[in-house]
Amino acid sequence: GLFKVLGSVAKHLLPHVVPVIAEKL
């Protein structure tokens, strides 16, 4: 249900979020 949707969304967002966080660190 909801967690499955959140999991798929996270998989799509992580590749974009990780580089941004890495740059700030």
From Swiss-Prot:
Classification via InterPro entries: Caerin_1
Keyword annotations: Amidation, Amphibian defense peptide, Antibiotic, Antimicrobial, Immunity, Innate immunity, Secreted
Annotated GO biological process: defense response to bacterium; innate immune response
Main localisation: secreted
Location within or outside the cell: Secreted
Domain of life (superkingdom): Eukaryota
Residue numbers bearing the Leucine amide modification: 25
Gene Ontology, cellular component aspect: extracellular region
Tissue: Expressed by the skin dorsal glands.
Task of the protein: Antimicrobial peptide. Adopts an alpha helical conformation which can disrupt bacterial membranes. Strongly inhibits the formation of NO by neuronal nitric oxide synthase (nNOS) at micromolar concentrations. Acts by a non-competitive mechanism, probably by binding to calcium/calmodulin and as a consequence blocking calmodulin attachment to nNOS.
Entry text on domains: Contains two amphipathic alpha helix regions separated by a region of less-defined helicity and greater flexibility.
Family per record: Belongs to the frog skin active peptide (FSAP) family. Caerin subfamily.
UniProt-recorded name of the protein: Caerin-1.8
Species whose genome carries this gene: Ranoidea chloris (Red-eyed tree frog)
